[in-house]
């Protein structure tokens, strides 16, 4: 942790930033679901499959979904990208944390006022976590990587791609649960609100990070 004297921004280790992002994002996904407001958009499709086919955990279905996102990016790039495979590994760690937090989340109180707080906290943390991931200078989890890379490929601003990606995930989740379970599951008012606003929330969090921090991966120093 160093102070960049040129612009007074604090320099932080990129690897540490990535680890923090993975932990808070996985915790926030579980916390948002626990709040009763619905699953976050980035995990809504794996959630639908975990409810329809519960022999595999949410974390496992997340890993499968992330693999499909990586394959899609390689198809769009029309070449093999080595860093995408590291992103796949990071996604596996994220999936394991999802299952870990699911084991212990029930320890938290479930009163309505608490659940409102859980949604607010999870929303803010996801925005910070995604913004942190996008700036750590390292491959990030595929659900965060996909909108960022797609934005670069098709030359459309990130916030618009992020919102479109989230809304598409929710639409797929609604259709999957409706046909596989007979009713729409996992989607709540919080899910819809987050899907249509989180792109901007991530942008605001990113502006704050850019103003106050600079991230340098340790591997780039050597």
Model segments located where?
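Core subunits and conserved enzymes of cellular information-processing
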Residues: 2-222
